[in-house]
């Protein structure tokens, strides 16, 4: 015989709370790794989470030049000297963006999040991060970007708990870790309403 259906867990509502402790991601970078050619995160002993690829432009880039990434797996944010240029989504087939004019020596950051893996069929070898290369394309000319500094951000509590959190009331425009505390009279099932936030993880 089947056992009795257990009683439903209690449901609670958490009052609204605010975040006041913030650690900007780019100010809390882990140990850097160096590579001439770009490689997926598995080559850096990372299986999930987020990875940051950083290089400097060896020459000035003209407005209208295309940045081509082969390939983004799975969701990327692209920054030039800390300014967000665009976001690319593999699910939508987004692997290119048109750049503004950028000076020689501009710091180019590509922050890539892995969003799960294909686990069957011909795509089972689903590497994460950037799988092959990054190119600057102008007309019929292309130049592959080299000499990358790489930072791995695994998704686990031990990695994020010791960041340099600072008190602030101003939310940064850059990716960041957010931390707060709240008190409960009792515990139970609940949902967090993140509808006013952007993309991230709790």
What are these regions (language model features)?
Residues 49-63, 70, 98-105, 179-189:
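Extracellular and analogous surface-interaction loops
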Residues 1-41, 105-197:
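An acidic-aromatic loop/edge-strand motif
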Residues 50-54, 77, 87, 109-111, ...:
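Ordered hydrophobic segments in well-structured contexts
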């Amino acid at each position: 015989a089947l056992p009795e259906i257990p009683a439903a867990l209690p449901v609670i509502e958490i009052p609204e709370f605010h975040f006041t402790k913030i650690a900007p991601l780019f100010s809390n970078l882990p140990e850097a790794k160096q590579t001439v050619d770009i490689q997926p995160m598995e080559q850096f002993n990372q299986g999930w989470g987020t990875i940051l690829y950083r290089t400097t432009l060896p020459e000035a880039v003209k407005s209208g030049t295309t940045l081509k990434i082969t390939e983004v797996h799975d969701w990327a944010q692209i920054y030039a000297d800390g300014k967000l240029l665009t976001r690319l989504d593999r699910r939508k087939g987004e692997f290119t963006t048109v750049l503004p004019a950028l000076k020689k020596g501009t710091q180019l950051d590509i922050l890539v999040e892995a969003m799960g893996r294909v686990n069957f069929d011909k795509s089972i070898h689903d590497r994460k991060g950037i799988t092959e290369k990054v190119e600057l394309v102008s007309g019929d000319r292309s130049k592959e970007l080299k000499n990358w500094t790489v930072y791995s951000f695994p998704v686990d509590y031990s990695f994020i708990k010791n960041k340099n959190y600072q008190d602030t009331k101003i939310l940064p425009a850059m990716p960041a870790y957010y931390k707060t505390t709240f008190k409960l009279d009792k515990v139970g099932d609940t949902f967090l309403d993140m509808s006013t936030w952007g993309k991230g993880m709790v």
